[in-house]
Amino acid sequence: MDVLASYSIFQELQLVHDTGYFSALPSLEETWQQTCLELERYLQTEPRRISETFGEDLDCFLHASPPPCIEESFRRLDPLLLPVEATICEKSSAVDILLSRDKLLSETCLSLQPTSSSLDSYTAVNQAQLNAVTSLTPPSSPELSRHLVKTSQTLSAVDGTVTLKLVAKKASLSSVKVGGVAAAAAVTPAGAVKSGQSDSEQGGGGADTCPENKKRVHRCQFNGCRKVYTKSSHLKAHQRTHTGEKPYKCSWEGCEWRFARSDELTRHYRKHTGAKPFKCNHCDRCFSRSDHLALHMKRHI
């Protein structure tokens, strides 16, 4: 055994004299000394081998010249498509950028080439949002006017050579070919509003050219209210919600109910007469209110 001696010869003789025998098994101190010796040998040799091999690999990596195909790919690529200039890459010999020219070009073309499926999905989402807004808002609501105003989005490539302009206006679509790519886009009118304008600017500035915006001039004048209506009668009915005026009185004998809108009076008057003009198409049931008929129609779906 390669064990460091922890006792002298005199200590061993004294141990034999006192106990009558000498144990051949190593003690805890001898085991600890052996472990320290093995660790010291390991730490002196093993890291030196790793450092030598790592240094050799590092020297080969730093001093290796880049392949000529990579240099040609850097020269042929547009400098705007690369985050660093090709001249800097040539000067710094310590940096070896391993890029595949075909892979880089294919990824660049894929990122710059809009597919027809993505454009169709974009148009379908806008159409679905427009249908949801029109079905949930009354015809004179200002939220509907915001979504009916044409919204445009410009998709430009990195180098600025190919520009696709998408204008969604009520679902009138046509096919436009730009750079050999067929894209579904809307027809832009002659007086189209620029895409940089906001919704309020489009509603106000485009009122001269778009006939629909000319109608939306009836705005509520009360503080904090931004309601916009296409008809003056709708605006007057809305303003009565601020003033509390109820000019429509029920003419039924003994009824003192008053209403701010004429349709509310008509709906109330059916309670006296018992009229039910709204009939279900699937059954024989009739209703006095259209919203009650709509709730009933959901049962047949």
Curated annotation (Swiss-Prot):
Gene3D superfamilies: Classic Zinc Finger (3.30.160.60)
Keyword Chloroplast set for record: no
Tissue expression profile of the protein: Widely expressed. Detected in the cornea epithelium (at protein level).
Subcellular location: Nucleus
Pfam families to which the protein is assigned, alphabetical: zf-C2H2
Chain ranges passing through the membrane: none
Annotated Gene Ontology cellular component terms: cytosol; nucleoplasm; nucleus
Broad class of where this protein is predominantly found: nucleus
Biological process terms in GO annotation: axon guidance; axonogenesis; dendrite morphogenesis; glucose homeostasis; negative regulation of adipose tissue development; negative regulation of insulin secretion involved in cellular response to glucose stimulus; negative regulation of transcription by RNA polymerase II; positive regulation of DNA-templated transcription
UniProt motif 9aaTAD: location: 93-101
SMART domains: ZnF_C2H2
Keyword Signal set for record: no
Motif Nuclear localization signal location, chain numbering: 214-219
Keywords assigned by UniProt, alphabetized: Activator, DNA-binding, Metal-binding, Nucleus, Repeat, Transcription, Transcription regulation, Zinc, Zinc-finger
Task of the protein: Transcriptional factor. Plays a critical role in neuronal morphogenesis. Represses the corneal epithelium differentiation. Acts also as a metabolic regulator, by modulating insulin sensitivity in pancreatic beta cells and skeletal muscle cells. Inhibits transcriptional inducers of adipogenesis and has a repressive role in the expression of several adipokines, including leptin.
Protein name, as recorded: Krueppel-like factor 7
Species of provenance: Mus musculus (Mouse)
Lineage: Eukaryota, Metazoa, Chordata, Craniata, Vertebrata
